[in-house]
Amino acid sequence: MCENQLKTKADGTAQIEVIPCKICGDKSSGIHYGVITCEGCKGFFRRSQQNNASYSCPRQRNCLIDRTNRNRCQHCRLQKCLALGMSRDAVKFGRMSKKQRDSLYAEVQKHQQRLQEQRQQQSGEAEALARVYSSSISNGLSNLNTETGGTYANGHVIDLPKSEGYYNIDSGQPSPDQSGLDMTGIKQIKQEPIYDLTSVHNLFTYSSFNNGQLAPGITMSEIDRIAQNIIKSHLETCQYTMEELHQLAWQTHTYEEIKAYQSKSREALWQQCAIQITHAIQYVVEFAKRITGFMELCQNDQILLLKSGCLEVVLVRMCRAFNPLNNTVLFEGKYGGMQMFKALGSDDLVNEAFDFAKNLCSLQLTEEEIALFSSAVLISPDRAWLLEPRKVQKLQEKIYFALQHVIQKNHLDDETLAKLIAKIPTITAVCNLHGEKLQVFKQSHPDIVNTLFPPLYKELFNPDCAAVCK
């Protein structure tokens, strides 16, 4: 159905894959159903046609479809596929007219030239950021691209945008989709800041500090800078904005949809959950890379903190998409309760995750507080095998210092911070239980895990890395 190469008039081949997916802008894999698309959009269109799917749009039928939010509205995604010419009856590349092939060749050449120009323009700070993950320790997240700053997992890259401007990222991986993560190629990203906090010069008031005293060696301006950076990074890397979550709040899975989840095989639902978790983890990795203090840690410690803490941050972020009024969580575009996950065969894990989310919601945390608490959970000096634990500890102390005074500003309850810190053992316990359940599942379904689970998910929760991930 696809033809991935164009023979040039001179020598060699020009890769169609250099042209981004016409639907979502992700790394393309060739011509599918008549249009240059990624594997994710190809699979989405195929499933839609096979199932004669009829989708509805929860908004105004004009949703933006891009790499980040392509899974949010199936209706608008399918309409974009059709509008751009995707069809079961589309001709293959080999049957294109000479004019069509020449036009496609010209577009490939144009993209290749643009990419080459962008590579030549990279220098200074952009180059330093792009090479921060430059060495190779062993495998997985530690096997890192020396050219572009992408984070590898068994040869598959997490595509992480930089904080501003244009960057050319040689990404070995598209964003997670139903089709998995196994892709290679080039992705150009322009990161548009969503939230501008630079004008907030005094995020904290001096009156909120204990007797107006700062910890030794810590300045007010430094705490303010760290807090603004973390909060901005959090807001820009959440899967859903609070406005979107409010719009979706009462869109719950129907009885028929819940029964469909319950009737799935255990392995099918495990795979779906693994894909969703992997998607969430990619946002967490991007969040971490935007934290100034995190990027100043040595590469080894960055990797260890991500491997051991990314799922814990996903669990903290889960409270944003949890409705404590009816005990439901956002899953695949709608809210559903614990009964949706019966087929997993892990009721205790599901119960503990839901209980934690409900308890965290009861603290009524603001986005500022969730941002700072998430970063404090991630940047923990207690992780095993850190090379510079003292440096990690100093950064975490500054984050907690900022969190303490945001809480004092927002809450009458002086015990809120203590309550948050007391929840960290629960976070760790839930994540450890997830690891145990995964290993039990893997023992009975090794082929499913090895062939169908996302590579990043397998790498992060590999039992061989248990000493690191605790």
UniProtKB/Swiss-Prot annotation:
CDD domains the UniProt entry points to: NR_DBD_ROR, NR_LBD_ROR_like
Species of origin: Rattus norvegicus (Rat)
Keyword Isomerase listed: no
Keyword Signal appears in the UniProt entry: no
GO molecular function, one term: nuclear receptor activity
GO biological-process terms attached to the record: amacrine cell differentiation; cellular response to retinoic acid; circadian rhythm; eye photoreceptor cell development; negative regulation of DNA-templated transcription; negative regulation of osteoblast differentiation; positive regulation of DNA-templated transcription; positive regulation of transcription by RNA polymerase II
Tissue expression remark: Isoform 2 expressed with circadian rhythm in eye and pineal gland. Isoform 1 expressed in retina cortex, thalamus, and hypothalamus.
Entry-linked SMART domains: HOLI, ZnF_C4
Keyword terms: Activator, Biological rhythms, Developmental protein, DNA-binding, Metal-binding, Nucleus, Receptor, Sensory transduction, Transcription, Transcription regulation, Vision, Zinc, Zinc-finger
Residue spans, zinc finger NR C4-type: 21-41, 57-81
UniProt-listed InterPro entries: NHR-like_dom_sf, NR_DBD_ROR, Nucl_hrmn_rcpt_lig-bd, Nuclear_hrmn_rcpt, ROR_rcpt, Znf_hrmn_rcpt, Znf_NHR/GATA
Family listed: Belongs to the nuclear hormone receptor family. NR1 subfamily.
Record text on subunit structure and interactions: Monomer. Interacts with CRX.
One annotated Gene Ontology cellular component of this protein: nucleus
Record function comment: Nuclear receptor that binds DNA as a monomer to ROR response elements (RORE) containing a single core motif half-site 5'-AGGTCA-3' preceded by a short A-T-rich sequence. Considered to have intrinsic transcriptional activity, have some natural ligands such as all-trans retinoic acid (ATRA) and other retinoids which act as inverse agonists repressing the transcriptional activity. Required for normal postnatal development of rod and cone photoreceptor cells. Modulates rod photoreceptors differentiation at least by inducing the transcription factor NRL-mediated pathway.
Composition skew (Basic and acidic residues), residue ranges: 104-117
Disordered: annotated span: 104-127
Motif stretch (AF-2): 456-461
Limits of the NR LBD domain: 222-460
Pfam families with a match to the protein in the record: Hormone_recep, zf-C4
UniProt protein name: Nuclear receptor ROR-beta
Domain observations: AF-2 (activation function-2) motif is required for recruiting coregulators containing the LXXLL motif, such as NCOA1, and control the transactivational activity.
UniProt effect for mutating residue 457 to A: Inhibits transactivation activity
Portion annotated as DNA-binding: 18-93
